[in-house]
Each structure stands twice: as structure tokens, then as C-alpha cells.
UniProtKB/Swiss-Prot annotation:
It comes from Shigella boydii serotype 18 (strain CDC 3083-94 / BS512). Residues 43-64, 77-186 are annotated as: Disordered. This is Cell division protein ZipA. Essential cell division protein that stabilizes the FtsZ protofilaments by cross-linking them and that serves as a cytoplasmic membrane anchor for the Z ring. Also required for the recruitment to the septal ring of downstream cell division proteins. The lineage of its organism: Bacteria, Pseudomonadati, Pseudomonadota, Gammaproteobacteria, Enterobacterales. The gene is zipA. GO terms for biological process: division septum assembly; FtsZ-dependent cytokinesis.
Length: 328
């Protein structure tokens, strides 16, 4: 925007300068032409003054009829001079007079020569020369042209100053204080977690109880505390429990004597930390779940009861590592 405004100011200034040059050139030519046109008139005036001077000399030296002859012929001579002096005298005199304030270098004394040699009887002859001055309005359109020319030159810098005023605070912007980033608090590591996975029947069906119990026992689970099945360190049930298996239906318990029952699925869970290597225990847990699902015709699901995916398995492993690091 500043560049556009600067370009506009340059164009306006150039136009104003060109207008002033054209106006000055036009005025100079007009004044020069008026001076050339006034020269024949001045010669006529000087000739007329010489005639008047000769008549005055004759009047002073002559007597009688010569004086009467001068009085009788003076009006005739005045009429001849008035006829010889055309009206352009009034048309040229105003432009020369109006040009004086603009061109003080011009020599106006030439216009003042006739009054010095004009005698007293010739004064009534010069009065009608200055009386018809209604033709001066022709010079009126010249004077208003000079006034509006400098106006755009003085008015042009004003918007430039206004345009640069708002740029002062922008020139030296103060650096804003940069807010230091708040220290990121490390998420506290979990010291314990529970890994859960499910073995469920397909949608709209349930698992057979007798087939389910046989597959659970084949996977190494033994019925024990809380009426649920546990997988111990040793397949014969000795050693600490690594993970457990419960019924998906509340209260989650089993009755080994019941053969005729059905369930939508079972839940296998492992508490971390646990005995031994938790990652190896997790692999054994996943193998047991996959064995039971294959035997009963079910599927392995995650803790949200969604299809188990490799991404979810890696998430479980990351949780186990986090707990191990927190308890190291």
C-alpha cells in the first residue's frame, strides 16, 4: 500500500510540475507577442508626441494666424490620431498590465513614455483612450489558472505524512515476551496392571460347558481358589499361579460337577508384576487362550471384547515393560 501511495504522489507531482511549466511557457509567449504588437502603437504615440511638440514650438514662436491655425487644426489632428489609434491599444494594454505581477523582469517604462511628452492641450485626447476598459474581463481567466496550479503540490504531501504516521510504531516493534513452554510432566509409570483377554463364542452362539471344561484342563488350568481355574508354574498345580481363568457370566465361578451348561465365553487375566518373567508368562497365557478357542470353536478377544490384533498385543507388552521398569 505504501508503494502504491508513493507512486500516486510521484504521478501527481509530475503532472503539477508539467502544468506549471506549460502555463509559464504559455504566459511567456503571450507576453512576448503582446510586446511585439505594442511596438507599432508606441511608434505611433511617439510620432504623435513629436507632432504635438512641433505644434507647441510653433505656438510659442508664431503670432496671429499661426495661433488660430493651430487651434483650428488641433481637433483635426486629434481626430486623425484617434482614428489612427485603433482599439487594439486597449486590447493589448490589459494583458501587459496583468503580466507585470508575474513577470517583474519586464521593463514597463515604455508604457509611461507618452505621459511625459504629452502637453496640456493633448490631455482631453488621452482621456478617451483609458476610459473604454470593459475589455479587462478577458484577462480574468488567466489569474485563476495560476492559483489552482500550486494547490495539488501543497495538498499532495499531506496524505503522504498521514500515511507514514502509522508506520512509526511498526518500524520499531517491541519484541513480545516469549512464554516459556511449561515443563512437560512425565506420566507416572504404573507399578501394577492387569492383562485381560477373552475367549468367546461367535456372535449369536454359546460355548458348550463339557467341551469347555475339557479344553481348560488340557491347557494346564487347575480348579482352585475362588472357584475358578488357575495356571501354575508347574502343570501339576505346584508353584505360584501365573494367570487365572473365570466365567464370563457373573459371578464368574465354575462348578466342575456340572456337565450340562453353556456360557458365552471365559476371561483369562494376569496380574503384573507376577512370579518369574512377565513377558514369558504373557506368551504362555496367549497360547492357552488360543488353544481353548481352537478346541471350542471360539475367538480370542481383547479386554474391550474386540478382535485381538497385533497392535493390541504390542500394547500389552509395552504395559508389562512399563510395570517392570517401575518396579526395578
Amino acid at each position: 500500500m505504501m508503494q502504491d501511495l508513493r507512486l500516486i504522489l510521484i504521478i501527481v507531482g509530475a503532472i503539477a510540475i508539467i502544468a506549471l511549466l506549460v502555463h509559464g511557457f504559455w504566459t511567456s509567449r503571450k507576453e512576448r507577442s503582446s510586446m511585439f504588437r505594442d511596438r507599432p502603437l508606441k511608434r505611433m504615440k511617439s510620432k504623435r508626441d513629436d507632432d504635438y511638440y512641433d505644434e507647441d514650438v510653433e505656438d510659442d514662436e508664431g503670432v496671429g494666424e499661426v495661433r488660430v491655425h493651430r487651434v483650428n487644426h488641433a481637433p483635426a489632428n486629434a481626430q486623425e490620431h484617434e482614428a489612427a489609434r485603433p482599439s487594439p491599444q486597449h486590447q493589448y494594454q490589459p494583458p501587459y498590465a496583468s503580466a507585470q505581477p508575474r513577470q517583474p523582469v519586464q521593463q514597463p517604462p515604455e508604457a509611461q513614455v507618452p505621459p511625459q511628452h504629452a502637453p496640456r492641450p493633448a490631455q482631453p485626447v488621452q482621456q478617451p483612450a483609458y476610459q473604454p476598459q470593459p475589455e479587462q474581463p478577458l484577462q480574468q481567466p488567466v489569474s485563476p489558472q495560476v492559483a489552482p496550479a500550486p494547490q495539488p503540490v501543497h495538498s499532495a504531501p499531506q496524505p503522504a505524512q498521514q500515511a507514514f504516521q502509522p508506520a512509526e510504531p511498526v518500524a520499531a516493534p517491541q519484541p513480545e515476551p516469549v512464554a516459556e513452554p511449561a515443563p512437560v510432566m512425565d506420566k507416572p509409570k504404573r507399578k501394577e496392571a492387569v492383562i485381560i483377554m477373552n475367549v468367546a463364542a461367535h456372535h449369536g452362539s454359546e460355548l458348550n460347558g463339557e467341551l469347555l471344561l475339557n479344553s481348560i484342563q488340557q491347557a494346564g488350568f487347575i480348579f482352585g481358589d475362588m472357584n475358578i481355574y488357575h495356571r501354575h508354574l508347574s502343570p501339576d498345580g505346584s508353584g505360584p499361579a501365573l494367570f487365572s481363568l473365570a466365567n464370563m457370566v457373573k459371578p464368574g465361578t465354575f462348578d466342575p460337577e456340572m456337565k450340562d451348561f453353556t456360557t458365552p465365553g471365559v476371561t483369562i487375566f494376569m496380574q503384573v508384576p507376577s512370579y518369574g518373567d512377565e513377558l514369558q508368562n504373557f506368551k504362555l497365557m496367549l497360547q492357552s487362550a488360543q488353544h481353548i478357542a481352537d478346541e471350542v470353536g471360539g475367538v480370542v478377544l481383547d479386554d474391550q471384547r474386540r478382535m485381538m490384533t497385533p497392535q493390541k498385543l504390542r500394547e500389552y507388552q509395552d504395559i508389562i515393560r512399563e510395570v517392570k521398569d517401575a518396579n526395578a
